[in-house]
Design a protein with these regions (language model features):
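Pyridoxal 5′-phosphate
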Residues: 1-120
Length: 120
């Protein structure tokens, strides 16, 4: 099969699948808990964040503006919601205008509609 729609879904590398399966089999602890499985899960998540930050910003994992946080989301819609609602609320004192177009992804448009109902 030849799959050409990598905008929506991209097949991951086999090594990524193997690592994920290992984590699901052995790293299922709640990372917010204090028992050993939870502590191990927290350590795994911190290591993953560090690897992603280093891939994005180099060996220090820091950008030009200093340290960065990395938030894992369940997917694009959740990430869009977090970014758009967060930016709108953070910057609302500078103005409540949001510019978008009808060709945006539905997740973006729904955020903008919700913000419009809140006076943006």
């Amino acid at each position: 099969m030849i799959y050409l729609d990598n905008s929506a879904t991209t097949k991951q590398y086999d090594e990524v699948t193997e690592i994920m399966v290992e984590a699901m089999k052995n790293g299922f602890g709640n990372p917010s808990s204090l028992y050993q499985l939870g502590l191990d899960a927290e350590k795994t998540i911190k290591a993953a964040r560090s690897r992603v930050l280093k891939a994005a910003f180099g060996e220090t994992g820091k950008g030009g503006a200093g340290d960065y946080d990395l938030v894992f989301t369940s997917g694009g819609t959740e990430a869009d919601n977090m970014a758009i609602f967060g930016a709108a609320k953070l910057l609302q004192r500078q103005g409540r205008q949001i510019v978008t177009t009808a060709v945006e992804h539905p997740a973006v448009l729904e955020c903008c509609r919700a913000l419009e109902e809140q006076g943006f």
